[in-house]
Amino acid sequence: MPRYKLTIEYDGTPFAGWQIQAELPTVQGVLAAAVKGFSGEEAHVAGAGRTDAGVHATGQVAHIHLARDWRPDQVRDAMTAHLRPHPVAVVAVERVADDFDARFSAVKRHYLYRIVNRRPDLALDRDRAWRVPQKLDASAMHVAAQRLLGKHDFTTFRAAECQAASPEKTLDQLDVMRSGDDIRIVTSARSFLHHQVRSMVGSLIRVGEGRWSADDLADALAARDRRRCGPMAPACGLYLAAVSYPEQIVETGAPDRI
């Protein structure tokens, strides 16, 4: 059975998240329906990341098995036709080895969080960025963010319902960049805890407002106490931007799209 790797982008606003849920619209659900629509097969669409309700993606990766040997461009175009009118697009399809797994073969996941730092409401970026009206010091946020890099117990930034076996994660990147009113927070790690990125962003906002120092953020991390976390940032600003795989597998959703 041929195995295909799909690179997917989507607007998460109308969905109850990635994972199939009974009687709720999900990204995985509409992708599975699209596969069945053109192939007649009940294929499992296995994703690299289980994004929450309202979270977007520019570089989600999934894999599927199909009984028939289709050309990758045929799979892409057929899924495009069957995904309409949902705000989901399969932007690339590749044939991959049978042991490729979108989730377990991944060596790094890259997330982007978008903030628009202005008082006026958002007309074009509504539901696609977090509008923060109070002035933020992005430079202070970036300096503080570096205190979270490396291997730590991230219990402070972990959702109560997180099912991960351990709260320890290794954070490889957490950069805060400003251009005009736009603030972009880019973070990378092999994997993240449930709500970890949004929790870190919410805490960095306190630094940007001048309410916390870099030491305060480091102390919150060291406390390993969810009650020490800042307010969790909303889902609308978060994007799964890219997923990286070992060198023998082409990197998908290249970070230059972030």
Swiss-Prot record:
<dbReference type="GO" id="GO:0031119">
    <property type="term" value="P:tRNA pseudouridine synthesis"/>
</dbReference>
<feature type="binding site">
    <location>
        <position position="111"/>
    </location>
    <ligand>
        <name>substrate</name>
    </ligand>
</feature>
<protein>
    <recommendedName>
        <fullName>tRNA pseudouridine synthase A</fullName>
        <ecNumber>5.4.99.12</ecNumber>
    </recommendedName>
</protein>
<comment type="subunit">
    <text>Homodimer.</text>
</comment>
<dbReference type="InterPro" id="IPR020103">
    <property type="entry name" value="PsdUridine_synth_cat_dom_sf"/>
</dbReference>
<comment type="function">
    <text>Formation of pseudouridine at positions 38, 39 and 40 in the anticodon stem and loop of transfer RNAs.</text>
</comment>
<feature type="active site" description="Nucleophile">
    <location>
        <position position="52"/>
    </location>
</feature>
<dbReference type="GO" id="GO:0003723">
    <property type="term" value="F:RNA binding"/>
</dbReference>
<dbReference type="Pfam" id="PF01416">
    <property type="entry name" value="PseudoU_synth_1"/>
</dbReference>
<keyword id="KW-0819">tRNA processing</keyword>
<dbReference type="GO" id="GO:0160147">
    <property type="term" value="F:tRNA pseudouridine(38-40) synthase activity"/>
</dbReference>
<comment type="similarity">
    <text>Belongs to the tRNA pseudouridine synthase TruA family.</text>
</comment>
<dbReference type="InterPro" id="IPR020097">
    <property type="entry name" value="PsdUridine_synth_TruA_a/b_dom"/>
</dbReference>
<dbReference type="InterPro" id="IPR020094">
    <property type="entry name" value="TruA/RsuA/RluB/E/F_N"/>
</dbReference>
<dbReference type="InterPro" id="IPR020095">
    <property type="entry name" value="PsdUridine_synth_TruA_C"/>
</dbReference>
<keyword id="KW-0413">Isomerase</keyword>
<dbReference type="InterPro" id="IPR001406">
    <property type="entry name" value="PsdUridine_synth_TruA"/>
</dbReference>
